[in-house]
Amino acid sequence: MIKIENLRMEFEGGVTALDGINMEIQDGEFIALLGPSGCGKSTTLNCIAGLLDPTDGTIRSDEVDITNKAPKERNIGMVFQSYALYPHLRVIDNIAFPLKQKKVAKEERYDRARKMAAKLQIEHLLDRKPTQLSGGQQQRVAMCRAMVKEPKILLFDEPMSNLDARLKIEIREVIKKLQAETRITSIIVTHDQEEAMAIADRIAILDNGRIQQFDTPFELYQHPVNLFVANFMGNPPMNFIDARLVKGEGGLCFLVDGQTVPVPPARAKALAGSLDREVKIGVRSHQMRPVEAGAVGAIRLKVQMVENLGKELLVQAQVGKNLIRISEEDTTKYAFYRGLADVKGEMGILLTDQINVFDSETKANVLMEQ
């Protein structure tokens, strides 16, 4: 288990990169550190690797304090964004290099290098130089080199940033499969939320040097703790609708741009104590039902445009100052929505029990306050 407690990192000039990071990572887990540029994810990884000395806090591996240990004493393998291969060495020598440093016999280190190359399906490339390989092949070599010494912890620092979309999916699948087979405790740094959700068992979302939420992809997507997490997870991003909680004829309602609509039954109890509170309704494109503008309980919106994505339509519509995206599964309605968009006609949406509700001032998820 890796245990990080109160990790702080301050650079010259008073810049705080990490402001109290706390994490527990179980043996065999695959963790993603996710967030925008400058949030502290790579700094956290480099502290774990021993490439940076934190200002304060501790890092433990299996109860052993490794905070101030040299990188070579941590039994860690690391895969970098730039591959960091030796251009003058053959692939097999690049892979075997960590074993050579450990003074492993030549026959054994080549044997282990070949076996690792076979796992990543690059055994036919062993006699080539890095310059003769594609980006995806070079990344596989870098992964082999990191894993050949059988590390206890495997770190990935944005390993797919230099790859095109198709290669990203390929390498993503390779990483996921390899980690599942070896069960090496692994941590990946990425700014791509789809990448993190596809690979990781749990994801830590960072912003301004702090962990905003550390949970499974499902929980982060369905139950974000605040507006930052809600906006960061999902493509398209979560929609936000400004509202106020009011008492209506049938019970608790949202007041949206002068319209009074009922709060979905499954959310009414949790919001009962929030009367007159200014909130933002958080709803994903597929978590609302498109209906006619005059439907009972619907929010009326003005249609701005429609995109045909093949498997669905993505309708953009506006209510007040909020532009939202609505998923429409019936692609035969493209002409209908296109017609509405041309004249800025109205449609309606019905909110479902899947909505989240955030306090407009604190940005916290009101549904998680209990």
Regions of interest found by a model, annotated:
Residues 34-36:
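The feature captures the beta-strand-to-loop junction immediately N-terminal to the Walker
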Residues 30, 71-232:
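ABC ATPase nucleotide-binding domains
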Residues 57-65:
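Conserved ABC transporter NBD signature motif
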Residues 247-370:
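Non-catalytic connector elements of ABC transporters
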